[in-house]
Amino acid sequence: MQKLIMANWKMNGNSTSIKELCSGISQVQYDTSRVAIAVFPSSVYVKEVISQLPEKVGVGLQNITFYDDGAYTGEISARMLEDIGCDYLLIGHSERRSLFAESDEDVFKKLNKIIDTTITPVVCIGESLDDRQSGKLKQVLATQLSLILENLSVEQLAKVVIAYEPVWAIGTGVVASLEQIQETHQFIRSLLAKVDEKLAKNIKIVYGGSLKAENAKDILSLPNVDGGLIGGASLKAVEFNEIINQANKICTE
C-alpha cells in the first residue's frame, strides 16, 4: 500500500521559513505510486504553500468549523477549504480536543461537512497516558470512532484516513513502542472490520507521535502502519525529506 507522509506544522513558521521549507521539500525525489505527501500549514499561509509546492504534494488545513456560512467570526468553512484548493483536512487532533474542548460529536460534525467533497479527511484519535495505564485504551478509541462508524456509509468511510496519535507521545519525545503501535493499529483495523472487511484492509491508518527520521524506518515498516503524521520533525526539510526517503525505500523493497 502507498505510504502517506504528512507534515503538521501547527502554529509555526512565517513567510520566510515556510518558503525555505517548501523549497526544501520540493527537492525530495520519490515515487508517487509508493508515497504520497501532504502538508498542513497554518491557514494564513495555505495559499502561499500551494503556490510554492509541486502539484504532487497535497496541502491541507488543520481545522474547520462545522457551520456552513454566516456570523461566525474567525471560522473557516468546508466550502472555503474546497474553494482555495486544499486537498486534505485534519480533524480532531489531540490539541484541538484537549485545548479547545472538541468533542467526538464536534469531530463527526466537521467530518460530515466534507465527506462528500473532494477533500481527504484525516481523523485523529488517541489515548492519554492515564487511559493506557488504566486499561481503557480500546474503550477510548472505540468511543472516539463510534459516531463515525455508525453514521457513515462504507463508501464514505473509504475516503477517510485515520491517524493514531497517543497523546502522551505528542511533542514529548516519548515514542510508543513498536509493539504498542502495531497492536493499536491492529485493534483500530478490527473495529473497521466489524463494518466491512474490505474497508478494514484498504483504509489508511497512519501513526503520529514523535515520529522522526531516526525511528521512521522501524515504525513505517510495521505491517499495519500506512504512513505518518509528523509534527516537530516536519519543520526541518532535511529531516522531513529523510522520512519521505525511508518511506520510499520501504515501499520499494
From Swiss-Prot:
Lineage: superkingdom: Bacteria
Catalytic reaction(s) noted: D-glyceraldehyde 3-phosphate = dihydroxyacetone phosphate
Organism this protein belongs to: Francisella tularensis subsp. mediasiatica (strain FSC147)
Any one of the GO CC terms: cytosol
Family indicated by similarity: Belongs to the triosephosphate isomerase family.
Function as written in the Swiss-Prot or TrEMBL entry: Involved in the gluconeogenesis. Catalyzes stereospecifically the conversion of dihydroxyacetone phosphate (DHAP) to D-glyceraldehyde-3-phosphate (G3P).
Keyword terms of this UniProt record: Cytoplasm, Gluconeogenesis, Glycolysis, Isomerase
Pfam families, per the entry: TIM
Active site, per annotation: H93, E165
GO BP, one annotated term: gluconeogenesis
Pathway the protein contributes to: Carbohydrate biosynthesis; gluconeogenesis; Carbohydrate degradation; glycolysis; D-glyceraldehyde 3-phosphate from glycerone phosphate: step 1/1
Predominant cellular place of this UniProt entry's protein: cytoplasm
PANTHER family reported for this sequence: TRIOSEPHOSPHATE ISOMERASE (PTHR21139:SF42)
Lineage: Bacteria, Pseudomonadati, Pseudomonadota, Gammaproteobacteria, Thiotrichales
Protein name: Triosephosphate isomerase
NCBIfam families, per the entry: tim
InterPro entries: Aldolase_TIM (IPR013785), TIM_sf (IPR035990), TrioseP_Isoase_bac/euk (IPR022896), Triosephosphate_isomerase (IPR000652), Triosephosphate_isomerase_AS (IPR020861)
Assembly mode: Homodimer.
Example GO molecular function: triose-phosphate isomerase activity
Location relative to the cell: Cytoplasm
